[in-house]
Amino acid sequence: PVQHDAAEPYGYLIRHEECGTVLFATDTYFLKYKFPGLNNVMLECNYSKEILDANFTAGRIDKKRYERTIKSHMSYDNCLLTLQANDLSQVCNILLLHLSDNNSNATEFIHGIERLYPEIEITAATNGLSLTFNKNPY
C-alpha cells in the first residue's frame, strides 16, 4: 500500500524480462519503502509547494483543496526524497506522473531531477507519450 486518502491505494513493483524492475507509484504523498534493483521509475510528482502556496494565497484554490493536495499527492520535494532514498545506479528512465495542471511546472521538475541524475532520461507524462523501457539504456 501507498499513503493516500483512497480506499485501496497501491503502488507496484513490476519485474519484466525486457524492462527489468519498474517502480510505479501514483496517488501517494510519500513512499516509506526502498526498492532495490530498479531499472525504470514511474513516480507521481504532482505539485510544487511554492506554486501551491502561491495559488492558495491568491485565492485560486480553496483551503480544502490545498490541504487535500498536501495529504494525498506527492510534492516535487517528496519525489526528490524518494528518488534519493533509492539506488538509481541501474535506472534508465524516470517518468514523472500525475502532474497538477495548476500547481506544477514540468520543465522545472525535469531540470531539477536532471541536475541530480544527468545520466538518466527524465520525462513528464503527457497524453499519447510513448517510451521504451529497457533494462539497459542502449
Segments predicted by a language model, with ranges:
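Core dinuclear metal-dependent hydrolase active-site scaffold
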Residues: 1-40, 133-138
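Cap/insert and terminal regions of metallo-dependent hydrolase folds
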Residues: 35-127
